[in-house]
Amino acid sequence: MMQSFIRGTSSRAVMEHEMQDLMDQDPPSFGVRKLCQKGWSIAEIDGSILNHDTHGFDSFISALAHHDQELMDELRKTLIGRGIQVPTMNGNQKFINLDNSASTRTFTPIWNTFRQTLPQSEPVKQEIIQEVKTICSDFLNAPLADYEVIFTSNTTEAINLAAENLSLESDNTIEPVVLNTLLEHSSNDLPWRMIPGCSVVRLSIDGEGFVDSNEMEGILKAYNQEGQFGKKRIRIVAVSGASNVLGVCNNLKEISRIAHCHGARLLVDGAQLVAHRKVALDDCGIDYFAFSAHKVYAPFGSGALVVKKDQLHFTPEEMEQIQISGEENAAGIAALGKALLLLKRIGMDRIEAEEQVLTRKVLTEMAQIPGLDIYGIKDPDSNRFSDKIGVIPFEIKNKIATQVGKELALIGGIGVRSGCHCAHITVKHILHVGPGLEKFQKLIVTLFPKLSLPGVVRISLGIENSEADIDRLILALGSITDKQNKSSKKEAKRLMNKFVDAMAEQIYQTV
């Protein structure tokens, strides 16, 4: 049945049939030789577990260029947890998730793929893992002839592997340096600090979060060409593909050009990038690319390091231990493969375009709320707006970030993230928290543990979000900034306890 989908037929009837087949929520029955017949492509053990015929697929997309929106709409209907009600000060309301940067929820086809993989035999699981490597390679434009795909548990483990790989370089004539930025998540900061004898230098960022390519070139030249710092040489430039705090996407192609021009390699923390933008490792000249499945609608404990083969310093025995030590998370890897296939079928250009519309709406309407300050790119008409994903950090005057997060939940049933977002360096920078103030804050928190350190509130969009979600957000923010509106903490606690008791009872009854 899926052959017509792969060949690229433009028949409207067939398209609707295949779309339903793709989204079917009923678990298929499968025998000894089949993984699934619905929701995935080809499932013969002796054939292709996950058909990734990109030529046929591209033909299909081309023929149905005006229907990718329908596929996205159908996918949204299968969101796990869609329509769940949560208690608020205004009664039960549908939960709105605006915390996609922390972790994305999943969809039924991806969930089905995960659970259908669990009972499979080891040979089938190994076939699936190899197929998903090809899917990752295709999705990221990282040819398997040149790149190795190493599955991990998350981005942090992937970057730890890259850091360990750097530590294996045997050149006693230099002291390795990693060039980082002020934008980095702890996953792309702490691993580099753990390398013996390695130091970290950070690039500054401007008011919107962008690095200065001239500063970068100057630092690389000073270290690698002029030898101004003795034996220290920058070996890796490690940057985020998209900031998890400010949402900005720096020019990876330009960063790669400068890095390679001065004898350094480029590692990209792609955790926040993969679900939002088209990525081309080969075209950009990226040497290492790390990402997590839970940021890309497959929250089942997998991730990957995609690395140029000529950059690996592990022995064949060490590589084998890395890849197959213990039992691999085949089901999580399969879910990742399914998620990437779905994103490609929808089209990353479509996903980016929709997200830009919502981001523009958020920025425009939040700018009208008194006492609310947005960090990073604020103006949707800025010429750099196109370099921003749907991540918007903000604060409300005279309110602690964690309190704003709680009030959004209580008033609107909206889930956001507040605090430092595992990017303390970035948040301290944008809030202008100097060393003296930081020490004072730590002392205060030690004396009064219930107090929260300064942070920002973060809204982060995903493909599940709609303009209606933004409307509810703006309404709730308006209510929070209205000084006349005072919610009762006692009533909020009562509602929450009632909700928890009801959910617990429901779970026990189900069991």
Model segments located where?
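Pyridoxal 5′-phosphate
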Residues: M2-V511
